[in-house]
Amino acid sequence: MTHTLIWTLNSPEKLSSLSKTLIEDEKYSCFVSKTSLFEIAIKKNLGKLYFYSSFEDLQKELSTLKIEFLEIELGHLEFYLSLPQIPIHKDPFDRLIISTAAVENLKIITKDEKFNLYQDIVETVW
């Protein structure tokens, strides 16, 4: 999911046509979990990602695209605790994004096939 945000802003040619439509067409609502922002902050801090000088600039860009932020809520964290432990997928950021999408009844736009491990919990599109 975080890669979808990065590609939307830096490399839109990497997005599938369906993903672009879902993100850009105003008849759809599009959200980004603040979990993704935390993941971006970590990658920036480690020098693994060069992405916007500030989160305020990022927020302005997302608002032009009509993309809204999802706060991390207690219900998302409670759901996180109930997610099945899958040995080949332990990424805490992905798991919190999955929990958020499940609680909010949202689809996840991702190319990451590991999200398919949770197909009984959330729907993914690419």
PLM region spans:
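Short, well-structured N-terminal submotif of metal-dependent ribonuclease cores
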Residues: 1-32, 48-60, 118-119
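General small-molecule cofactor/ligand-binding pocket signal
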Residues: 31, 70, 123-125
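Alpha-helix capping/helix-boundary segments
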Residues: 4, 36-37, 76, 97, ...
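Active-site neighborhoods of divalent-metal-dependent phosphate/nucleic-acid chemistry enzymes
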Residues: 52, 64-111
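A secondary-structure boundary/capping signal
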Residues: 1-2, 33, 73, 111
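Generic structural signal for small/hydrophobic residues in well-ordered secondary structure
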Residues: 2-3, 40, 80, 101
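Charged phosphate-binding loop/patch that engages nucleotide di/tri-phosphates or the phosphate backbone
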Residues: 103, 107-109, 113-126
